[in-house]
Each structure stands twice: as C-alpha cells, then as structure tokens.
Regions:
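HhH-family (HhH-GPD) DNA N-glycosylase catalytic core used in base-excision repair
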Residues: 1-133
C-alpha cells in the first residue's frame, strides 16, 4: 500500500492517481490532473533523464515546464530534490527577496544547496534581524 513513507515510481503514481478513492484521500484538489499528467509524462522519459546521463539542467527544466501546471519554481524543485541537480535554484518569494536585498549570486555547482540555507535564514527570521526588521 502506498503512503507508508515511500515515494512511488512514476508508473505507480499514475496508477494510484487513476484510483478515485485513493486520489480523494490525498486531497490534491485542482492539482490532481497536473500531477497525473506529470507522472504519465515521466513514464515516457528516457531512463537517462532520471540518471542524468548527458542531460543538462536546462534541458530538464525545459521539458518539465512543458507539463501543465509546472512553472520555473516547481521545475527547479523537481530538478534539485528529485533529480539531484545541485545547481538548480528554486526561486520563491523568500529567495527573490534575498536576491533583491543582498545582491547575492548563486554558486555554479551548489546553488541549490546554498538556496536552502538562505531560504531557512530568511524565512526563520535571521534575515529579518540582519535587515533591521
């Protein structure tokens, strides 16, 4: 049974989302068709996509953003957390604020890891204290 702390593979996820009762328990609401389309599309990806063989971050981002409901931030999150592109930097409100207020730039190889620290720093208030807020 899915939901016991495991992450289903794309094929399993597509099957689970096709089950109305199971999908209702997830409470995905309007996001369900987007997730279902993404899982179905992931099935068609070449295995190299998941192994990152000869696939650049830009190629992965472009392909992900072609999926309904997936924009730059979500694509960056998938690339960083799901596909292991440590250079992917998801930009949300907190990160955009940090960029604007500090003029910071991101490490070419580990920007995604750097982003996680900056996100926590700004969101948890340390950034506010440093900014005099």
């Amino acid at each position: 049974e899915a939901g016991g702390g495991c992450v289903p593979k794309p094929g399993e996820l597509a099957g689970l989302l096709a089950d109305e009762a199971f999908a209702a328990r997830l409470k995905l609401g309007y996001r369900r068709p987007y997730l279902e389309a993404l899982a179905t599309r992931a099935l068609a990806w070449h295995p190299a996509r998941l192994d990152r063989e000869d696939v650049s971050l830009e190629e992965s981002m472009t392909e992900l953003e072609e999926c309904p409901g997936v924009g730059p931030k979500v694509a960056s999150c998938i690339c960083l957390f799901g596909l292991g592109y440590l250079e992917a930097v998801p930009r949300d409100t907190w990160i955009k604020r940090a960029e604007r207020e500090t003029g910071m730039s991101w490490d070419e190889r580990y920007g995604g890891i750097q982003q996680q620290y900056v996100f926590a720093w700004y969101r948890e208030g340390a950034g506010r204290h440093e900014r005099g807020v």
